[in-house]
Design a protein with these regions (language model features):
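C-terminal transmembrane helical hairpin of 12-TM major facilitator-type secondary transporters
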Residues: 285-328
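Conserved MFS/SLC helix-loop-helix module at the cytosolic interface between two early adjacent transmembrane helices
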Residues: 64-103
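Juxtamembrane intracellular "pre-TM" segments in multi-pass secondary transporters
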Residues: 2-10, 189-226, 248, 415
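Helix-breaking motifs and short loop linkers at transmembrane-helix boundaries and internal kinks
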Residues: 78, 99-104, 116, 250, ...
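Short amphipathic helix-loop junctions that connect adjacent transmembrane helices
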Residues: 32-49, 239-256
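Cytoplasmic helix-loop-helix junction between adjacent transmembrane helices
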Residues: 108-148
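Helix-to-loop junctions at the C-terminal end of transmembrane segments
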Residues: 66-78, 270-284
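A membrane-interface helix-boundary motif in multi-pass transporters
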Residues: 162-175, 365-391
Length: 415
């Protein structure tokens, strides 16, 4: 079953969206409760913050080395088998996490899970396979919206289940991952025809080499830096949100589940519906510029918020920020040839994984420095102030890059 005809490509899009939805629901389920689960093995808030950073770091470093390998394998053998491997890996990791008897077991499980988890990168390659260059920004937006819907349903469900038992969300997430495996086996078509596959090379699966190749793509070098800064800010948010809101507002799994529900809802609304309208009136470059400014202001306001309800208000302020990732992905994908989409998106995933490695060190590290301060203290927002700075620097780089590209294009036209 393949998606290498126009009708097949059109029909394949709903299949991959359903796959991503179930995948992200399962991941989203554990977000509100994983820090609390780590806390059951530690004796203080400071230790909990530190070890949650270690658990997140372990997943990220394994994913950094695993993503380009799995991306290159998907260029060789097709997207479908690599996605199925990722679903099986997720199911194993969720069940093993729920049953972990000690902290070192939890760390080991996250290491294996990170090495096998490249579903996001392969899904992006899948969408690139079945889309024309003109369709990619909109379809990456739909993919981002599906991620958002998964994070609507996942965290709020995980928060409610976590109130019953901390381990219950992990069992439910494992069940969803198994369901996704069955869906992939019986329903999901292959998107990469045999004629467009390429041999596997270990050299190209090296994450450092992958990042160099990504920077070498014509016209996207500075955008890689923008993506890196944006990813570091986003993953710092992910790695500190639950701990931060607990320290500042005294929130538990239920409150964090609802707040992450709101983030996912806004992401889905913007990328699933509003982005199509925005692209009719704006270029992806303009959306990147406006989105980075919006994100910088939002991170600053999240860090400054003196009351919990304000966290919800700031989500609305970040409306344009939800368009940045899809816009950047479409520009990078359009710069790569058809036989290299898996490797290119694997390289993007490696970049994201590297930032996911650094985020717990920076976010949890900064939060550890201020965790002794009283609830509601100004300095508890330090990780978010850091994220605002990252987005501001990314905005400056993007503005300069697009201005230079415009000047170069104008000079070429005049010649």
């Amino acid at each position: 079953m393949t998606a290498d005809t126009p009708r097949g490509r059109q029909a394949a899009m709903p299949f991959i969206l359903v796959t991503v939805l179930i995948d992200m629901m399962s991941i989203g389920l554990i977000i509100p409760v994983l820090p609390a689960l780590v806390g059951t093995f530690t004796g203080s808030t400071t230790d909990q913050t530190f070890w949650f950073g270690v658990v997140s770091f372990t997943f990220g470093i394994a994913n950094f080395f695993g993503s380009p390998v799995l991306g290159a394998l998907s260029d060789r053998f097709g997207r479908r088998p690599v996605l199925l491997l990722g679903f099986c890996g997720l199911a194993f990791s969720f069940f093993a996490t729920a049953l972990a008897p000690a902290l070192w077991v939890l760390v080991a499980v996250r290491l294996v899970s990170g090495a096998l988890q490249a579903n996001a990168a392969v899904a992006q390659s899948y969408v690139a396979d079945i889309s024309t260059p003109q369709e990619r920004a909109r379809r990456f937006g739909l993919l981002g919206a599906t991620f958002g819907v998964g994070f609507i349903l996942g965290p709020v469900t995980g928060g409610l289940l976590g109130d019953i038992d901390l381990h219950l969300p992990f069992y439910v997430a494992g069940g969803l991952a198994l369901l996704n495996t069955l869906y992939g086996v019986f329903v999901l078509p292959e998107s990469l025809p045999a004629s467009k596959r390429r041999p596997f090379e270990w050299r190209r699966a090296n994450p450092v080499h992958s990042l160099r190749e990504l920077r070498a793509l014509r016209g996207v070098g500075p955008l890689v830096t923008v993506m890196a800064l944006g990813s570091l800010a986003q993953f710092t948010l992910h790695s500190t949100w639950v701990l931060y809101t607990g320290l500042k507002f005294g929130w538990g799994p239920r409150e964090n589940g609802w707040s992450l529900f709101a983030v996912g809802l806004m992401s889905a609304l913007v990328q699933g519906g509003l982005m199509r309208q925005l692209l009719k009136r704006n270029t992806p470059q303009k959306l990147v510029r406006l989105g980075l400014i919006s994100s910088a202001l939002s991170y600053l306001c999240w860090g400054l918020a003196p009351e919990g309800w304000m966290m919800y208000a700031v989500i609305g302020l970040n409306l344009l920020g939800f368009t940045v990732t899809a816009s950047l992905q479409s520009m990078v994908s359009n710069a790569a040839d058809a036989t290299s989409q898996g490797r290119t998106m694997g390289s993007v995933a490696s970049l994201n994984s590297l930032m996911a490695v650094l985020a717990p060190l920076t976010g949890a590290g900064l939060l550890t420095l201020v965790s002794h301060r009283p609830q509601g203290d100004f300095w508890i927002g330090l990780p978010f102030y850091f994220c605002a700075l990252l987005q501001a620097v990314a905005a400056v780089i993007a503005f300069r890059h697009f201005r230079q590209r415009s000047a170069t294009s104008a000079a070429s036209s005049a010649a």
